[in-house]
Amino acid sequence: EVKNAFEVYEHLLEMNPYSRKDMLKAHKMLMHDLTKEAGAFRQGGVGVFAGKRLVHMAPPAERVPQLVKELMDWVKKDPAHPLIKSSVFHYEFEFIHPFADGNGRMGRMWQTLLLYQWKPIFGWLPIETLIRERQEEYYRVLGEADHKADSRVFIEFLLQAIYDTLVEVESTEQVRVQVSEQVQRLLDALENDTLTTK
């Protein structure tokens, strides 16, 4: 799995975040030799479990291609701030759960790709690592958002993780010299921007 992840990351920033073909290609690389459904949308029902308790039942498999297309169209065209759009995309992607396996990592990677399209610095920030370090909270807020049918708590969690990553990178001496101006502008935007579409 680690070898596969490295291969995806080698090619991720060359991919089009609005292309289902590229998404399927990334999934095929990520899940190569791990599942028979690598590189294909799931064919059956799938649920997300916390232990033995079902916390989310994903939409029917036959709806997945259209739901993913609609989500990609929305994220491409909506005028919302890219930080908000990428976070909403991540939530909706996990809600759709388009693959039999690998949805969490794909959602995090695709959010990174969307953010990279906005500001290339995001291609080099360890946001996914920070989210993985907070995996228990990640799944808790994802479940809470799903239960309430309100994605705000999940979006707030992701925005905080992005902010924390930027602060961590900005405070690292070696990296500060290379990216401090870009990171500082992003931090300023996060602190000063209301992140609305207006």
Q: What is each stretch, according to the model?
A:
Residues 1-198:
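FIC/Doc superfamily catalytic core
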